[in-house]
C-alpha cells in the first residue's frame, strides 16, 4: 500500500518526501521493524518513540509518523500528525482491509467480569452457529488456534492484523475485551463495534489513571464515541449494567440504543427469583424477547451479572432467546475464574484472578455462602501498580477469611516485603491474631493472618493447615502462569503449585 493512501485517513499537519513510496508493514516497536516499514513514533509513559526513529531506520523503516517535527529525520519520508496513536489506529485498519467492517464485533469493558463475559458471549455465538474469535486477558483464540495474550487489548497494529488473520481463517464474529488503557491510547478507535458491553467500574489502574473519574472517562469512550451508528453499521447497541453507579451514568450518555441489564425491575434484561447454590445459579430470565427459566453452573452473584451482560449482548445482536439460553446454560469453563484444583483431602481449592478489592470481595462473598468449613485465603498485590488497593484487599480478606496468608504477586521492581508491609496495614487494625508462619504448621483455631514472601511457601502452608471441608482460595493470579520479579518473568502457576502442595502435604514431606 502506498504511503499517500495511508496519509489520506489521518489529516496530516505536514508531510515530507515521496508519498508514492510503497509501505510493506506498520510498526510501533523499533525492534520489530522490517524493510519497507512505516514506523510510528509514539510518546509513552516511560519512553518516547521519537528517540527510536534512527533505530527504526537502521532496521529498514522507510517512513515515520511523528508528532514533533523538530525530531524529523533528514532524507526520510515523514508525516506529522497531532495524535500519532489515533493515526496508527486509522492507518492500521486501512492497511489490513478494515477487518471489523464485515463481521459482528462485541467489545466488553469494565473492571471485573470481562473475561467470563467473553466466554459466555462466545458460547452464545457458538449456539447460534456463528464461529467467533475471542481476544482477551487469557488468550487470543479461534477454533483450535490459541495464542497467549501479552495484553488484554493489543496495540492497534497488532489488533487489526490479528483480527484480519482470524477473519481470513473463518471467524464470522469477534468478541473482545477492551481495557481502559486501550481506550485511553486509542487502540480500538478504528474497530467498528456492533455491541459495546459495560460490566462495572471499581478501583483499579489508578497507577495509570489519575483518579476514578479519569478511569471512568477512558471506559466511557466506548459508549459515548465508538459505538455510534454509522453508514457501515447503522444498527448498534450498548449493553450496560444499570445497577452499577457508573453504568447508570452511561445509560444517559451512550450514543447507541441502550439495553440495560441488572436486577432492578426496570432493567431491559434482568433475573428474577434467583437461587444461588453449590450447583450454580437458577432463576427466571426476563428479556425484550421473552421470559424463561435458566440455570448456569457458574457460581455467585457476580457471575449472575456476567450472565446478564452476555444475555444483553445477545439481545443487541438480535439473537433468539432459545439461542441465548443455550449459550449461557452450556458448560462454560473459564481458566482461573473460581477454577477448582482437585485433591484427595476433601478440601475445596479455588484459583481466581481476583486482584482488586471489589473482585476479591465478590469471590469471598460467594465462597462464604458456600462454605461449610473454614476459608483460607492466599493473596498478594502487584508491584509498580496502584498502592491504594493494598490495605483495602487485606481488610476484605480479613473480614471473610478464617486465615489470611499475605504473599507476593508479581512484585516487579518493588521490594516484596515492603509491598506485604503495606498490605498488612489493612488487616492489623482489625484485631485478628497475627500468626508466625511456623506455628501454623500445627494448625490454627483463632481467626487470624500471617505473611510469607514466597508465594510457593504460602500455598504450601495453606495446604498444610487445611482440613476436609475447608476452602482454600488462591487469589490474584488466576490463569497467569508466571511471576514477575524485578524485570524478569519466571514460570509460576497457582494451579500447578496447589497440586504439588497438596500432594506433598499428603505424603508428609
Swiss-Prot record:
Keyword Kinase (UniProt): no
Keyword set includes Metal-binding: no
UniProt binding sites for ATP: 110-116
GO molecular function (one): ATP binding
InterPro entries: Mur-like_cat_sf (IPR036565), Mur_ligase_C (IPR004101), Mur_ligase_C_dom_sf (IPR036615), Mur_ligase_cen (IPR013221), Mur_ligase_N (IPR000713), MurE/MurF_N (IPR035911), UDP-N-AcMur-Glu-dNH2Pim_ligase (IPR005761)
Pathway connected to this protein: Cell wall biogenesis; peptidoglycan biosynthesis
Post-translational events: Carboxylation is probably crucial for Mg(2+) binding and, consequently, for the gamma-phosphate positioning of ATP.
HAMAP family reported in the protein's UniProt record: MurE (MF_00208)
Described purpose of this protein according to its UniProt entry: Catalyzes the addition of meso-diaminopimelic acid to the nucleotide precursor UDP-N-acetylmuramoyl-L-alanyl-D-glutamate (UMAG) in the biosynthesis of bacterial cell-wall peptidoglycan.
Protein name: UDP-N-acetylmuramoyl-L-alanyl-D-glutamate--2,6-diaminopimelate ligase
Originating species: Geobacter sulfurreducens (strain ATCC 51573 / DSM 12127 / PCA)
Gene: murE
